[in-house]
């Protein structure tokens, strides 16, 4: 039996990642401000510090905080401004951290679009051939020796060896010759009895 597997193409994955600019909102940022359009309220640093230190941490609310995000709540005392909800929030606590003019400001226009293209094709074929096995079995059948069929009514004397059947007289004086003939006759009788019972 022969087994052949033909895989013409394995799965191929091709990915393309591309970037291009888009018309996202341009924001002016400085220091540690968040990435969206902000309106800054520039408080007096000393007045702000006095205001924040005069309040207990439990009394500080969203209007006093620089950020409502729990990840940045650690910066409430040092980097907060008082502003309303509609205006943007800033994490800058003093005017000194911001440049005095627009020259030093960073203009940010950023957008990332990612496209991934995946192509996968699997072509396979399996063929199983049993020709060699059949040819082998025919070859073995030809090599088998053909023995005479023993009929139930056949004469037992035809199947008893005599001295002429031996090779070069090797079995003429064999001490097991009598036992062999007796055993062969007994086996023949058992075979005949089995055939009759069937």
Curated annotation (Swiss-Prot):
Q: What is its main location?
A: host cell
- Listed GO CC annotations: host cell cytoplasm
Quaternary structure (record): Homodimer. Interacts with VP1. Interacts with VP2. Interacts with NSP2; this interaction leads to up-regulation of NSP5 hyperphosphorylation and formation of virus factories. Interacts with NSP6. Participates in the selective exclusion of host proteins from stress granules (SG) and P bodies (PB). Also participates in the sequestration of these remodeled organelles in viral factories.
UniProt keywords, alphabetically? Glycoprotein, Host cytoplasm, Magnesium, Metal-binding, Nucleotide-binding, Phosphoprotein, RNA-binding
Q: Does the keyword Kinase apply?
A: no
PTM comment for this protein? Answer: O-glycosylated. Hyperphosphorylated on serine residues, when in dimeric form. Phosphorylation by host CK1 is required for the hyperphosphorylation of NSP5 dimer.
Q: Cite the record's Polar residues compositional bias ranges.
A: 91-100
A GO term (biological process) for this protein?
A: viral genome replication
Which InterPro entries would you find in this protein's record?
Rotavirus_A/C_NSP5
- Protein name per UniProt: Non-structural protein 5
Q: State the superkingdom.
A: Viruses
Q: Which residues bind Mg(2+)?
A: 92
Region feature (Disordered): 16-37, 53-72, 85-104
- State the organism of origin: Rotavirus A (strain RVA/Human/Indonesia/69M/1980/G8P4[10])
Coiled-coil residue windows: none
A single Pfam family, by name?
Answer: Rota_NS26
Record keyword Ribonucleoprotein present: no
Which positions bear Phosphoserine? 67, 154, 156, 164, 166
* Function, in words: Plays an essential role in the viral genome replication. Participates, together with NSP2, in the formation of viral factories (viroplasms), which are large inclusions in the host cytoplasm where replication intermediates are assembled and viral RNA replication takes place. Orchestrates the recruitment of viroplasmic proteins such as capsid proteins to these factories. Participates in the selective exclusion of host proteins from stress granules (SG) and P bodies (PB). Also participates in the sequestration of these remodeled organelles in viral factories.
């Amino acid at each position: 039996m022969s087994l052949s597997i033909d895989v013409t193409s394995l799965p191929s994955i091709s990915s393309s990642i591309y970037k291009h600019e888009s018309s996202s909102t341009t924001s002016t940022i400085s220091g540690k401000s968040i990435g969206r359009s902000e309106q800054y309220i520039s408080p007096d640093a000393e007045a702000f510090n006095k205001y924040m230190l005069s309040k207990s941490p439990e009394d500080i609310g969203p209007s006093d905080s620089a950020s409502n995000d729990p990840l940045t709540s650690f910066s409430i005392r040092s980097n907060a401004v008082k502003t309303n909800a509609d205006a943007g929030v800033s994490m800058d606590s003093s005017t000194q951290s911001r440049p005095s003019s627009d020259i030093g400001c960073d203009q940010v226009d950023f957008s990332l679009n990612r496209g991934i293209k995946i192509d996968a094709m699997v072509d396979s074929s399996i063929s199983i051939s049993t020709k060699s096995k059949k040819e082998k079995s025919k070859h073995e059948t030809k090599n088998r020796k053909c023995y005479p069929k023993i009929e139930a009514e056949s004469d037992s004397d035809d199947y008893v060896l005599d001295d002429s059947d031996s090779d070069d007289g090797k079995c003429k004086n064999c001490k097991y010759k009598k036992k062999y003939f007796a055993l062969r006759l007994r086996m023949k009788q058992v075979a005949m009895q089995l055939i009759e019972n069937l």
